[in-house]
Amino acid sequence: FNIKQKYTLAYDLASTFTNTIIPSDKKILDDEIAYVALHFVNYIDENSPQKKKRMLIISSLRRSETILLQNNILRNFPSIKEVKIIPKNSLSTTNVNNYNVICTTENDIFINNNKIQKISYFFNDTDIKKIELLLDGFNGPKDILDCFSEDLFYYGDAPSKNAVIKRLYEMAYKQGLADEKLYHSIMNHENVTSTYFGNYLAIPHPEIFLSETSFISVAILPKPILWDDEYVDIVFLVSIQKNNPNAFKLWSYLSFLISNNTTLEEIKKEPTFQNLSKVISKIYEDLF
């Protein structure tokens, strides 16, 4: 499930693409979609607006170490146009408005400027996810939390996958967020590919973007149910706003959450909307 969790947007695009070219009576395997998804990852990287973006890093590392850091960033983000590293004493004479993303390895710079994000000297996996989110325009936990609502939260038993989807859809319908077209699109998608994402989590969603507003309906189940040959006890029904090129970034924002098994367990430990909001807010605040 690594590709499915890490490259959620590319996987969803690959799923939609394969569904349009494969006969509807054929079930597409996750591994087959994952293979196609890798091609979408490469295409997105090559054609991403990130190619025009510039990154500034303030660091007191030795030159040999800054070169290593710079190379690590460019290797992980080949679409970035420029990574410039400057010492602390050059910050006051640098036009930071020329840069899309600004980071530092220095704790004092980070503490004194809330627009500058801290990264590690060693550039670890957390730093990679942090830069991914920054490049995608992530401003903070609110970008994700706005898609959740207590009116779209359910904790209780469910007899089957279809019953969970129906309940989550009906909650969204009552709030004026969904219609029957959306529901049928979700079920059509379920018929051709699995929406199990690992870590006992399923994310049913429509074949295409249909809703006027992005939203996420949540179900936490005290007893796991069977979901495409796997067991599930937490379900996110995700719908992305249509006709909004920036709305699809929600998939990127969610990938950090859905690949984090510890976080999902914390959500299930106290199955309330208040705890869900608290846990989601904390993991993104800790990241930044």
Report residues per predicted region.
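Short hydrophobic beta-strand micro-motif common in sensory/regulatory domains
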Residues: 1-90, 96-97, 101-112, 140-148
